[in-house]
Amino acid sequence: MANSFLDSLTLVRQNTPLVQCLTNSVVMQFTANVLLAAGATPAMVDTPAESAEFAAVANGVLINAGTPSAEQYQGMTKAIEGARKAGTPWVLDPVAVGGLSERTKYAEGIVDKQPAAIRGNASEVVALAGLGAGGRGVDATDSVEAALEAAQLLAKRTGGVVAVSGAEDLIVSADRVTWLRSGDPMLQLVIGTGCSLGALTAAYLGATVDSDISAHDAVLAAHAHVGAAGQIAAQKASAPGSFAVAFIDALYDVDAQAVASLVDVREA
């Protein structure tokens, strides 16, 4: 597993993947800083007139309808079309799906457009699979363990990887189930850590798409990178404000061997 982390992180830093982020306004700047610190290049191109064209030249695309508008929905649809036509991996982050009807309807309408990965919390994943009603806004009310069936259903339905974030992360693909223990509770006290993980997942998928690293391992490595950085940041910070700064620094500083040593991975 250490080799997977080493190779994935090396490719991200060597290739500086260009990630098109159609994401929510609350986390846009934080997401861009996370990508830059990790070794990727962010581009917040989300207008309908430009989204498809840009998705064709990007290495990865994030679709995150956390603060959606009618125009952004159109831009997301165009970006997905452009990504699919060009073979660009795209990631769906189903923010607050299940709890709000309009975004739930939209997410349900695009989930069959073959996202390379879906990343959300347990309640979002359960709701997207049609097995539950969603959480409390962006907060999960289901356990990660309870989302296993939903993640497996979505992985089979899309042919992609499904990642469920929590105290222990769950990574599921058609023939694998992996549990990852890492991170720190302080990550939950900084807005944007989850949403930026979706963007970083797109970066890892884009950087490794032409390698022998599987999409499952690329998604796992992205989560491990964030988890390890969270642990390092927690050792240096005493409160959320200083943690946010330390987290960005740790994403930049940490090497693959340190990531592998700080996370606990088990195959189910």
Swiss-Prot record:
It catalyses: 5-(2-hydroxyethyl)-4-methylthiazole + ATP = 4-methyl-5-(2-phosphooxyethyl)-thiazole + ADP + H(+). Keywords: ATP-binding, Kinase, Magnesium, Metal-binding, Nucleotide-binding, Thiamine biosynthesis, Transferase. Gene3D superfamilies: 3.40.1190.20. Substrate binds at residues 44, 192. Its cofactor is Mg(2+). ATP binds at residues 119, 165. Pathway: Cofactor biosynthesis; thiamine diphosphate biosynthesis; 4-methyl-5-(2-phosphoethyl)-thiazole from 5-(2-hydroxyethyl)-4-methylthiazole: step 1/1. It is an enzyme of class 2 (transferase). Pfam families: HK. The keyword RNA-binding does not apply. Its EC number is 2.7.1.50. GO terms for biological process: thiamine biosynthetic process; thiamine diphosphate biosynthetic process. GO terms for molecular function: ATP binding; hydroxyethylthiazole kinase activity; magnesium ion binding. Catalyzes the phosphorylation of the hydroxyl group of 4-methyl-5-beta-hydroxyethylthiazole (THZ). NCBIfam families: PRK09355.1. Belongs to the Thz kinase family. This is Hydroxyethylthiazole kinase. It comes from Corynebacterium glutamicum (strain R).
